[in-house]
Amino acid sequence: MVEPQVAPIAPMMRRIRRIHFVGIGGVGMGGIAEVLLNLGYQISGSDLRKNQLIQRLLSLGAQIRIGHDPQHVEGCDVVVVSSAIDEDNTEVSAARGRLIPVVPRAEMLAELMRFRYGIAVAGTHGKTTTTSLIAGILGEANLDPTFVIGGQVNSIGANSRLGKGEYLVAEADESDASFLLLQPLLAVITNVDADHMDAYGGDFTALKAAFLEFLHHLPFYGLAVVCLDDPVLRELLPGIGRPVLTYGTCKEADYHLRELKQTQGQTQFQVARPGKDNWLTVVLNLPGAHNALNALAAIAVAHELGIADSAIQRFLKGFSGIGRRFQCYGEIATPAGKVLLVDDYGHHPRELAATLEAIRAGWPERRLVVIFQPHRYTRTRDLFEEFIRVLSQVDVLLLLEVYPAGEAPIGGADSRALWQAIQTHGQVSPILVEDKEIIGEMLFDLLQEGDLLLTVGAGDIGALARRLSISLEGKR
């Protein structure tokens, strides 16, 4: 077999030596920084606080400072900014004053993708899992892809990797419309839902138009892979104007599944594929019908790239997961007895509903105790009624205060308002937790043997899950 070669770097990047990242601790920023570091560029960066990703980049040779200062951009050739960074940031202003190019994260990702076979995964929900599955299957087939993913791939302990093959697999982020900077050869869209609406002026039509424009960035010989189960994607289908493959649960989809069965954390199903008479039997080491659809998208991509069925089946069965995507900490021995602890990144009602459905299907006999941290006041406001409906379905509910993600509080869109509304709804009596530090003591009285404890949200609740996995056992 011929050893794959690293794809060439864009010619214009040859003039670039040092690249500075403002907000380097973000998962998308840090992933790109690691790939560039491994390509031989000098990487520097700054952020407001240190985290595991920054520690990893430091160990790889990046120069990172905590806090922002104009002097940090001295000597750099280009500055990459996260969408979370304000325009008046002191480092950004200093770079512009020195006529140093300032580019958004997605533009740098587009440069990495430009001279490779770019595979971009977009969609409101399921991007990280689908991207991880595609990259993993390509790796299993010895295609050695480069990838940049919005979550830590457990098997390698990182969210990005520089490969020697021709493929680059990445998430395409619609939250700030930056995915419109990408020009992949193959694009996947998992679904389109109302989220990040502030970036689109609160106009769902504008959001749909952005997804359609994203697909129009494909070349005429490219390929769009879209989920036919999603009503919005069905609506957009006639306007795509590029080669299209569909996937879903309905028989009219090019790739469709049947006989879906879940046993605890594993899901089994069969897949029909165009041009194949036999059904492909798949065992996926993830729970839930939503993850089966994510895997189906990855199977469609893999099949189109000519990857053998055996490699697809082998990888999906052995998939070790992604950090904070239904991350199972296993059975924790508490004073009340053994409790199964699961942590998940879900922060939209549709994501919460999918996770709860997977839990009820895989562990129907367990009482479900949920600790939920809402993410952003705007999302809580915009999806308030949907949050009430979904969260009312659990057995025990603890509500943490909204994780603001830089937003100012909005009246009637905080956790107290959510708590009151769920109480009025009457199906569950939620507990408002105003101090996360005492939640371990609260759980001491609430938990029962055999419970499934789910921590869920996109803020800092993941750190709470890690602490609980230790502290609850310590109270035995």
UniProtKB/Swiss-Prot annotation:
Keywords associated with the record: ATP-binding, Cell cycle, Cell division, Cell shape, Cell wall biogenesis/degradation, Cytoplasm, Ligase, Nucleotide-binding, Peptidoglycan synthesis
Catalytic activity, EC: 6.3.2.8
Entry's Gene Ontology BP terms: cell division; cell wall organization; peptidoglycan biosynthetic process; regulation of cell shape
Database matches in InterPro entries: Mur-like_cat_sf, Mur_ligase_C, Mur_ligase_C_dom_sf, Mur_ligase_cen, Mur_ligase_N, MurCDEF_pg_biosynth, UDP-N-AcMur_Ala_ligase_MurC
Pfam family, one: Mur_ligase_C
GO MF terms held by the record: ATP binding; UDP-N-acetylmuramate-L-alanine ligase activity
Compartments where found: Cytoplasm
Catalyzed reaction equations: UDP-N-acetyl-alpha-D-muramate + L-alanine + ATP = UDP-N-acetyl-alpha-D-muramoyl-L-alanine + ADP + phosphate + H(+)
Residues the entry annotates as binding ATP: 123-129
The keyword ATP-binding belongs to this UniProt entry's keyword annotation: yes
Main enzyme class: ligase
Any Gene Ontology CC annotation: cytoplasm
Pathway recorded for this protein: Cell wall biogenesis; peptidoglycan biosynthesis
PANTHER family given in the database record: UDP-N-ACETYLMURAMATE--L-ALANINE LIGASE, UDP-N-ACETYLMURAMATE--L-ALANINE LIGASE-RELATED
Family: Belongs to the MurCDEF family.
NCBIfam families per UniProt: murC (TIGR01082)
Function: Cell wall formation.
Name of the molecule in the record: UDP-N-acetylmuramate--L-alanine ligase
